[in-house]
Amino acid sequence: MFKIKGLRWYMIGLVTIGTVLGYLTRNAIAAAAPTLQEQLHISTQQYSYIIAAYSACYTIMQPVAGYVLDVLGTKVGYAMFAILWALFCAGTALANSWGGLAVARGAVGMAEAAMIPAGLKASSEWFPAKERSVAVGYFNVGSSIGGMLAPPLVVWAIMAHSWQMAFLITGALSLVWALCWLYFYKHPKDQKKLSTEEREYILSGQEAQHQAGNAKRMSAWQILRNRQFWGIALPRFLAEPAWGTFNAWIPLFMFKAYGFNLKEIAMFAWMPMLFADLGCILGGYMPMLFQKYFKVNLIVSRKLVVTLGALLMIGPGTIGLFTSPYVAIACCASAALPTSPCPVR
């Protein structure tokens, strides 16, 4: 049978496309917010409830989604969640009030809670430990790409047809991807198009529990007592409000504060996401550059990256000092840059 060279990179490419489409469906509500406010007479406070519904359901469902993925496996579990978020996203088109939108987006949040855990699980299955951070970096880039695509695509759908069409299109794209995932994704042990050499390279470079396929699950109490867990959770808790702001509020901010029309939103609202992508790439190289040119060790170099990121986060706090909308966008973009290299991402 024909073997595909470097098949693991095709698999992470498939994961990345799923992340792109997941964040496209997530950010569609933000790009459509000005139109929704006008046509459904939704206040800014009511819009915040819609966003809160998504975030709350996403948060509550994440540990449940991780458990379901462990039980059903990456292939079936991720496909199931992706089909659900695609249908719920398309179902958003049926809403005619802020309450209906909150229910629909909450359902999307519950399904999309599996997106990042599934990506991490696929990376652990398909990559040796030494390459896993690179693989995770690739599919994390998909989150920003999805955020970049949402404003122009959603605005185009609204101007060409209606806001309902924007959610139907984004939902349909995710549904197509879910079916492709179900067809193409297999564990390395079951993938017949994977060469023997690459299979051995992947499995020999994995931790013992992945090789044997019998990783022991940690209890909730063990996780909460784990220092590594808190090393990831605390930075995320502190940085996630910024990332959530970029995902949910920039189009509406540009519309309310600077009077941008839909075309202008489509032209500029994606820029912070572009800088988040750049940060995701640069964040991997900056520690090496600090070590090379400043002669510091690995730990210090990583601390310098995090410190530099924290300084850049000051940008949005200075928006009130300027009247130019383009300076405001630049301030937001500067703060989006470190959301990827920091531990939160």
UniProtKB/Swiss-Prot annotation:
Signal peptide: 1-32
Protein task: Transport of D-galacturonate. Cannot transport the dimer digalacturonic acid. Uptake is an active process.
CDD domains (alphabetical): MFS_ExuT_GudP_like (cd17319)
Recorded topology in the membrane: Multi-pass membrane protein
Pfam families: MFS_1
GO CC aspect terms: plasma membrane
Keywords: Cell inner membrane, Cell membrane, Membrane, Signal, Transmembrane, Transmembrane helix, Transport
One Gene Ontology term of the molecular function aspect: hexuronate transmembrane transporter activity
Family: Belongs to the major facilitator superfamily. Phthalate permease family.
Protein name in the entry: Galacturonate transporter
Gene disruption: observed consequences: Mutation of the gene causes a reduction in growth on D-galacturonate and maceration of potato tuber tissue.
Gene3D superfamilies named in the record: MFS general substrate transporter like domains (1.20.1250.20)
Subcellular location: Cell inner membrane
Residues spanning the membrane: 49-69, 76-96, 100-120, 139-159, 165-185, 237-257, 265-285, 304-324
Gene name per UniProt: exuT
Reported regulation of activity: Inhibited by cyanide and 2,4-dinitrophenol, but not by arsenate.
PANTHER family found in the cross-reference section: HEXURONATE TRANSPORTER, SOLUTE CARRIER FAMILY 17
Induction (record text): Induced in the presence of D-galacturonate. Expression is regulated by ExuR. Maximal transcription activity is observed within 8 hours of bacterial inoculation into potato tubers, well before any visible symptoms of disease are detected.
Catalytic activity: aldehydo-D-galacturonate(out) + H(+)(out) = aldehydo-D-galacturonate(in) + H(+)(in)
